[in-house]
Amino acid sequence: LMINESLEKNKDLKLVLGEPFLFKITNNTPELGRDIVRDWDVWNGQLTERRQIVKELADKYNAVFVPYFEKFQEALKIAPPEHWSVDCIHATNAGHEIMARAWLECVTKAGFIEE
């Protein structure tokens, strides 16, 4: 794994792994996201598996885990999916702010940076 190679080359490496996320944009779905909405059960099933894999890797390698999926689930209570994502996968500026705040919260809590 790339993680093993990286850790071998740098024993002081601190890993931060971000949880994958996906949005189901049903209003005016952009062309890039239409296959995701059309095949939502497949995409969402794969996402669930990948979320678990990333969490397991974070646990195995003592990495900081950033729960992006969870943070976006909270954000969806405030605004619809198209506010957070442009095409079901890529974040908007508002989505990037959610991600940045989540990342900072997690790495600060882990002691990687000072408050």
Named regions from a protein language model:
Residues 1-115:
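Alpha-helical cap/lid subdomain in secreted, periplasmic
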